[in-house]
Amino acid sequence: PDNLFISESGVIKLGDFGLAVQLEHSCSKRNNVCGTSMYMAPEVYEEEACLKSDVWALGISIIEMAENKNPFAGMASVKIMNQVLNKPSPSLSSSGWSSDLVGFVKKCLVKDANERLCVNDLLEVGVVVTNEC
């Protein structure tokens, strides 16, 4: 995605191009929706975006970086919406990655935002703590 930047030392940084909004907590709702359909969480399609919607986008971004392809690449926006709302969440291939990383992505891509971990909880997940993929 256009908002991922890689430094000369290989560090990946996320940018928001000034589109971010500050919310009080992870249950706060956004008043407007802006985003790319390939990264939109189920609740975004139902106009209920929240901070946990970004956790979904993180999971999709990790799959894209790890497998060098977005799981929704080549699909029209309407088909992506149907996939996100009605089909199982995408997953990271377990053949090339640790079970911790596969599990981390799975936690990011829980369909129900109320059940999805928030960023603070994700920081406690094994792969983040051990830094081993």
Map each language-model feature to its residues.
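Conserved activation segment of eukaryotic-like protein kinases, specifically the C-terminal portion
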Residues: N31-M40
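Conserved catalytic-loop aspartate of Hanks-type protein kinases
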Residues: D54
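Structural helix C-cap motif within protein kinase domains
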Residues: E67-N70
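Short proline-rich PxxP-based motifs
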Residues: V84-S95
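Conserved C-terminal C-lobe helix
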Residues: G96-L109
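Terminal C-lobe "cap" of eukaryotic-type protein kinase domains
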Residues: V110-E132
